[in-house]
């Protein structure tokens, strides 16, 4: 290793986006919300630990898979050209090996739950593996990512109730639209580069209606979660949280209105606070019951 060159360990941390926690927090908050809803309150430290660590591990594994799949495209995109796999600092074999280890660790956590959750974990893995390749063939790959990022909701209900009730599917549908909203903001950052290399994204598909599409997706997400949970939560705290989430969505719309790269990326990064707001509303609505 030459002087000043990053160590392998630091390169692996870059690969899994260790310094960018917003990505896994976007996965965590709806999953924890589902855990609290399925349990009608605090689900216990075992499940909180399993799903918190599992979310981090699987998102990290997904980064490894995504960077391997996209390495020939990423070198043509300003924001991703220096990623470890793309630059050659980490080999494809190393990235896949690290991803496999992380996925196996996550599966080890799932094994401490029940058979229904274990079965759903295979479906979640399949969607996770499919997403990087959807960007080549699907005009709205963000919808595929939405399913992948929402599987934790189904698994949370399965872990608590040993089944996946209709409520879980409603929450998954709503969450899918949230993912479309924030990942379209993300795609707006790279749109010029993606057009040159032939990558398919919702930002390209929506064209001049991209901002409207983002705002409509936010509205659908918040509406579905509000209507699905209003009877269950039965709390002014939850409704305040929904109002705050809506206010954040409107702010994001203001940020992206001019389609500036930095503002679109800022809106994307701040989305985890919107997710946290909804989770806090759910968790606090059960507090003290």
Swiss-Prot record:
Would you say which domain of life the source belongs to? Bacteria
Q: What is its EC number?
A: 2.5.1.39
Q: Which CDD domains match?
A: PT_UbiA_COQ2
- Database matches in InterPro entries: HB_polyprenyltransferase-like, Prenyltransferase, UbiA_prenyltransferase, UbiA_prenylTrfase_CS, UbiA_sf
Task: Please list the cofactors this protein needs.
Answer: Mg(2+)
Biochemical pathway: Cofactor biosynthesis; ubiquinone biosynthesis
Question: Biological process GO annotation list?
Answer: ubiquinone biosynthetic process
Which topology term describes how it sits in the membrane? Multi-pass membrane protein
Which UniProt key words apply to this protein? Cell inner membrane, Cell membrane, Magnesium, Membrane, Transferase, Transmembrane, Transmembrane helix, Ubiquinone biosynthesis
Q: Where in the cell is it found?
A: Cell inner membrane
Q: Which PROSITE patterns match?
A: UBIA
Identify the main location: membrane
Gene Ontology molecular function: 4-hydroxybenzoate polyprenyltransferase activity
Locate the transmembrane regions by residue number: 22-42, 45-65, 96-116, 118-138, 140-160, 164-184, 211-231, 236-256, 267-287
**GO CC terms, sorted:** plasma membrane
- Which reactions is this enzyme annotated as catalysing? all-trans-octaprenyl diphosphate + 4-hydroxybenzoate = 4-hydroxy-3-(all-trans-octaprenyl)benzoate + diphosphate
Q: Enzyme group, top EC level?
A: transferase
Q: Which family does it belong to?
A: Belongs to the UbiA prenyltransferase family.
Tell me the function of this protein. Catalyzes the prenylation of para-hydroxybenzoate (PHB) with an all-trans polyprenyl group. Mediates the second step in the final reaction sequence of ubiquinone-8 (UQ-8) biosynthesis, which is the condensation of the polyisoprenoid side chain with PHB, generating the first membrane-bound Q intermediate 3-octaprenyl-4-hydroxybenzoate.
- Write down what this protein is called: 4-hydroxybenzoate octaprenyltransferase
């Amino acid at each position: 290793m030459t002087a000043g060159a990053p160590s392998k360990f630091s390169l692996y941390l870059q690969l899994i986006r260790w310094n960018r926690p917003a990505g896994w927090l976007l996965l965590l908050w709806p999953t924890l919300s589902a855990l609290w809803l399925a349990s009608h309150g605090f689900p216990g430290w075992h499940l909180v630990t399993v799903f918190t660590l599992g979310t981090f591990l699987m998102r990290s594994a997904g980064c490894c898979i995504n960077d391997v799949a996209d390495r020939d495209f990423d070198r043509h995109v300003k924001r991703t050209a220096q990623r470890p796999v793309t630059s050659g600092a980490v080999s494809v074999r190393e990235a896949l090996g690290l991803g496999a280890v992380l996925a196996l660790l996550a599966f080890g956590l799932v094994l401490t739950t029940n058979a229904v959750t274990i079965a759903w974990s295979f479906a979640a893995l399949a969607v996770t593996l499919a997403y990087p390749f959807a960007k080549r063939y699907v005009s709205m790959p963000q919808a595929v990512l939405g399913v992948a990022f929402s599987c934790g909701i189904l698994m949370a209900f399965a872990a608590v109730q040993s089944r996946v009730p209709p409520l879980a599917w409603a929450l998954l549908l709503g969450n899918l639209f949230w993912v479309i909203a924030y990942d379209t903001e993300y795609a707006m950052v790279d749109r010029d580069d993606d057009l040159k290399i032939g990558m398919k994204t919702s930002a390209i598909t929506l064209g001049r209606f991209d901002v409207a599409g983002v705002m409509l997706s936010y509205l659908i997400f918040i509406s579905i979660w509000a209507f699905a949970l209003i009877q269950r939560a039965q709390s002014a705290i939850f409704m305040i949280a929904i109002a705050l989430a809506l206010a954040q969505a409107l702010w994001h719309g203001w940020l992206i209105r001019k389609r500036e790269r930095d503002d679109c990326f800022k809106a994307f990064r701040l989305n985890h606070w919107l997710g946290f707001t909804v989770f806090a509303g759910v968790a606090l609505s059960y507090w003290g019951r």
